[in-house]
Design a protein with these regions (language model features):
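Cyclophilin-like peptidyl-prolyl cis-trans isomerases
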Residues: 1-182
Length: 182
C-alpha cells in the first residue's frame, strides 16, 4: 500500500528527459514566456506541463489551462491563475507536496510558483510575482521565471480589480499554453 507521499507523487503522470523547458502563455493581454526549473522542482514542472498539454488526469478534458482566467491580481505583489472555476477555489482534483529548493527564492519580479492553501496542497494554481516577495520563501514551490513578457505581467498587475477578491473587472484569459522542449 502506498503512503500519502507516494500516492501524491504518482499523480504526476508523464516526465521526459530534457535539457530545457519553456512555457509560452498566450493571454488576452499578450504573451508571457517562462523558463521552467524541471531539475529543481520536477513535480511542479511536470504537473504544469502535463496539465498544459492535456496529458495529466484532471477535472477538465483536454489542455487544462486553455480558457482559464487570471482570477486574482494584486498590484505590486502578484498575478494568479489556474482555477478551473475562475474564483481561486478549485484545482485539478488532486494535490501534491511542496518542493523547496534553497537555491530558488522569491527574490525578484517574474518568479513563477505554485499557489496553495497550506503545506503540500499544490494542484493547478500558480502565480507570477510583480516584485520580490521573500516572505513567501519556504511556503510555496518556485518552479520557473519569466524570460520574456514581463511587460505583459506588469500590465496585468495594473488592471482594475474588485477590491474584495482582487478579481479583474475584465477577464484576462489564457488562450493557450505551449511547451517548448530543448
Amino acid at each position: 500500500m502506498f503512503g500519502m507521499d507516494e500516492a501524491k507523487f504518482e499523480r504526476i503522470d508523464h516526465r521526459e528527459d530534457v535539457k530545457k523547458l519553456i512555457a509560452k502563455i498566450d493571454t488576452t493581454m499578450g504573451e508571457i514566456e517562462l523558463e521552467l526549473f524541471h531539475d529543481k522542482a520536477p513535480n511542479a514542472v511536470w504537473n504544469f506541463v502535463n496539465l498544459a498539454e492535456g496529458r495529466q488526469e484532471n477535472v477538465k478534458n483536454g489542455p487544462f489551462y486553455d480558457g482559464i482566467i487570471f482570477h486574482r491580481v494584486i498590484n505590486g505583489f502578484m498575478i494568479q491563475a489556474g482555477c478551473p472555476h475562475g474564483m481561486g477555489t478549485g484545482g485539478p482534483g488532486y494535490e501534491f507536496d511542496n518542493e523547496n529548493d534553497p537555491e530558488l527564492s522569491h527574490d525578484t519580479e517574474g518568479v513563477l510558483a505554485m499557489a496553495n492553501r497550506g503545506p503540500d496542497t499544490n494542484g493547478s494554481q500558480f502565480y507570477i510575482t510583480l516584485a520580490p516577495t521573500p516572505h513567501l520563501d519556504g511556503g510555496y514551490t518556485v518552479f520557473g521565471k519569466v524570460v520574456n513578457g514581463m511587460d505583459v505581467v506588469k500590465s496585468m498587475g495594473t488592471v482594475d480589480v474588485d477590491p474584495y477578491n482582487h478579481k479583474p473587472d475584465t477577464d484576462i484569459m489564457i488562450n493557450k499554453v505551449t511547451i517548448i522542449r530543448e
